A protein has these predicted regions:
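Catalytic cores and adjacent flexible loops of soluble metabolic enzymes
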Residues: 1-186
Length: 186
């Protein structure tokens, strides 16, 4: 509901973060506009929804594209659409849309392929269990990490088993910061 989104947005801001979401239709997009979202995410299933992406571009706020179910030509079409509209405030997240994703299914080097081929900010949308794939992605240059979050791993749901508890999420973030320190001399 709109009230819930407003509450979540305030909670995120109060904790030094921000809320963004993947609108699947124009009604959801307009709801995000009303709450003054600071970014949009295009889920991999929406990558070919040109009309909604064009509408997002008009708002001139960051767009994060997830590539999970997108083919290479879909990615190129999305980037060309941004190019055509002189919009360059976007990133591509590498993703494997399997719940959960095993290490053998990852091909995490694809992050480097996306960055080199398209010369854009890249990240990783994770569906593995644990933090290892996220840490590997950061060590390979991912600038954005998306990881599912839960307060209770015993709940039912397609993504709950691979979601992180608050404690594990905090530890993952600390490990990411340590990797960043190892990579860059300030």
């Amino acid at each position: 509901s709109e009230k819930s989104l407003i509450s979540l947005t305030k909670f995120a801001e109060d904790n030094g973060s921000f809320l963004f979401s993947s609108p699947g239709d124009f009604s959801s997009l307009n709801l995000l506009r009303r709450i003054n979202t600071t970014a949009y995410k295009v889920s991999s299933g929406q990558f070919t929804n040109i009309a909604i992406i064009e509408e997002m571009i008009k708002d001139n706020i960051p767009i994060i594209f997830s590539t999970g179910m997108a083919k290479e030509e879909d990615i190129e079409r999305g980037i060309n659409l941004c190019d055509k509209n002189n919009f360059y405030n976007f990133a591509l997240l590498y993703c494997v849309s399997l719940y959960p994703t095993s290490s053998q299914q990852l091909n995490i080097d694809y992050i480097n392929h996306l960055e080199k081929k398209y010369n854009v900010i890249t990240g990783y949308s994770d569906h593995t269990i644990g933090e290892l794939a996220c840490l590997a992605a950061v060590s390979m240059g991912a600038k954005i990490i998306e990881k599912h979050f839960t307060t209770d791993n015993t709940l039912t749901g397609a993504d709950n088993a691979l979601s992180m508890s608050p404690e594990n999420f905090k530890k993952m973030c600390e490990n990411i910061r340590n990797i960043e320190k190892m990579k860059y001399i300030s």
